């Protein structure tokens, strides 16, 4: 029986496409790279940060990451907007007694949840700086399970990318794949999704709330 719901943030709970586009173009202007469009960003939303940059700009430099974390993220964080019904789903899940968590490749997820006004719903949140290895390695989800004292069999992870599905599979957790970014149902299923839905709003049957 599922009693723990774990969520990715980007393109799962929130539409962060504009935030990513603005952030990418801040990077482009600062480092003399090609500026990108919304369509460019949509095509790489489900990649890791390194893959995101390598696809857009053909490379990865350590100084980019430092600038991204310390300059870009604080300035674009407010541009992410909750998807319709996302907060209602969190509220409903909490009332039904579910434990709620976040596992994201963002750093400092509690700060993001606070900006979005939804930190109050979550029992724990784990980001890329809290574990040795980011997704698709299972470290984040295993950390969530350990912190909450729950078994993998009682948890479900919701995300929008094959990366999320592989992370869940590696942790032995069932997963819900959402086609809210650029991943197709086939891509999510091939990566191990237990169920696929177009959005959180259409996934209440899977979530149980």
Language-model segments: residues:
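N-terminal helical cap/lid subdomain that shapes the substrate entry/recognition surface
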Residues: 2-98
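Short amphipathic alpha-helical segments
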Residues: 18-19, 113-116, 169-171, 189-190, ...
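Substrate-recognition/cap helix-loop segment adjacent to the acidic, metal-dependent catalytic center
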Residues: 29-31, 53-59, 79, 87-101, ...
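Short acidic capping loops at alpha-helix termini that bridge into adjacent secondary structure
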Residues: 35-40, 120-124, 152-156
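Structural recognition of alpha->loop->beta junctions
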Residues: 118-128, 187-207
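Acidic, Mg2+-coordinating phosphoryl-transfer loop and its flanking beta/alpha structural elements
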Residues: 156-195
């Amino acid at each position: 029986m599922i009693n723990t719901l774990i969520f990715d943030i980007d393109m799962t709970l929130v539409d962060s496409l504009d935030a990513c586009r603005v952030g990418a173009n801040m990077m482009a202007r600062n480092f003399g790279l090609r500026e990108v469009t919304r369509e460019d960003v949509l095509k790489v939303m489900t990649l890791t940060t390194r893959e995101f940059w390598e696809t857009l700009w053909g490379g990865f430099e350590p100084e980019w990451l430092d600038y991204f974390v310390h300059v870009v993220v604080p300035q674009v964080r407010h541009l992410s907007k909750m998807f319709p019904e996302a907060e209602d789903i969190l509220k409903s899940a909490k009332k039904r007694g579910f434990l709620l968590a976040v596992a994201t490749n963002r750093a400092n997820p509690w700060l993001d949840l606070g900006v979005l006004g939804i930190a109050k719903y979550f029992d724990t949140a784990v980001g890329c700086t809290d574990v040795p290895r980011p997704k698709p390695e299972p470290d984040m989800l295993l950390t969530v399970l350990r912190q909450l004292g729950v078994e993998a069999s009682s948890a479900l992870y919701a995300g929008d990318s094959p990366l999320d599905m592989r992370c869940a599979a590696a942790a032995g957790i069932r997963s819900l794949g959402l086609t809210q970014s650029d991943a197709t149902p086939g891509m999510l299923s091939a990566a191990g999704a237990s169920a696929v839905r177009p959005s959180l709003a259409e996934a209440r049957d899977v979530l149980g709330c």
